[in-house]
């Protein structure tokens, strides 16, 4: 009896039967696994494709990238160090392929891992203390470091406000293009409060 839950305590078992069936095929008596659902051809997250796939708008390839094991066949392993839990998880997933994937790790040089993540266009890295027990939610034992990219854009327009928002909905952005004058690059609407508007 496999149940899949989001980090916001939303029950997703019926939305992703291919993941449910793959976890059931592991043949475990009982387990609590922690991971991230990824949509796309590789192992890099495409959040927009994930949302569209879960809503039924698109048919993305889903992968459940597993990075922790908290309970296995009647034994609570959440208090064991992270590296022990990951070794157990890797043994559980041995020989398994998509849609399940073991989320590998790098020990040591965080700066190098961050650089490689940037080269591969990943969102960033998660750094965890290898000797620590599991804690749900954020803690001092792990950090998320995102890749930061910046550029300069011109505001070329805006959309009308919706709901209780006043002023504008979002700002339309463009950058100079030698062939076409201006090239639309997207919109931004977060970060503005009523006082700024």
Where are these regions (language model features)?
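Catalytic cores of nucleic-acid ligases and guanylyltransferases
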Residues: 1-197
